[in-house]
């Protein structure tokens, strides 16, 4: 097998609210996700990335740092959530009930068919 056939093309992606950085690399097909991320230089560009805390994935599927990838895969580094999505939805529903924008019984949109009490 030639050296060329052992190499694959991959992308390392890190997204911030104001920008998305896509780094394209040619790496050995046996390289792990962690090795590829380190080789990409993204950790130097964004020192806030901590591979011990930030989750990583390939095409939106979580993977471990010791996983290998295939040709043309996209390795994504995920930022931690700032708030719990369930908690945000609960608060939004409470506010809608209080303001009258939600049915006080069901919590959904008020039904025009329901009789007012």
From Swiss-Prot:
Family matches, as InterPro entries: Mopterin_synth/thiamin_S_b, RnfH, RnfH_sf
SUPFAM superfamilies, per the entry: MoaD/ThiS (SSF54285)
Organism superkingdom: Bacteria
Region (Disordered): 90-117
Family to which this protein belongs: Belongs to the UPF0125 (RnfH) family.
Protein name as catalogued: UPF0125 protein VV0820
């Amino acid at each position: 097998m030639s050296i060329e056939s052992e190499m694959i093309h991959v992308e390392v992606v890190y997204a911030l609210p104001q920008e998305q950085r896509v780094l394209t690399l040619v790496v050995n097909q046996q390289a792990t996700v962690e090795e590829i991320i380190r080789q990409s230089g993204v950790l130097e560009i964004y020192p806030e990335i901590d591979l011990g805390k930030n989750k990583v994935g390939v095409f939106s599927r979580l993977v471990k740092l010791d996983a290998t990838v295939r040709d043309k895969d996209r390795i994504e580094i995920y930022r931690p959530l700032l708030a719990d999505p369930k908690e945000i939805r609960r608060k939004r529903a409470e506010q809608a009930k209080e303001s009258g924008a939600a049915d006080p019984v069901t919590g959904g949109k008020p039904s025009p068919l329901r009789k007012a009490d």
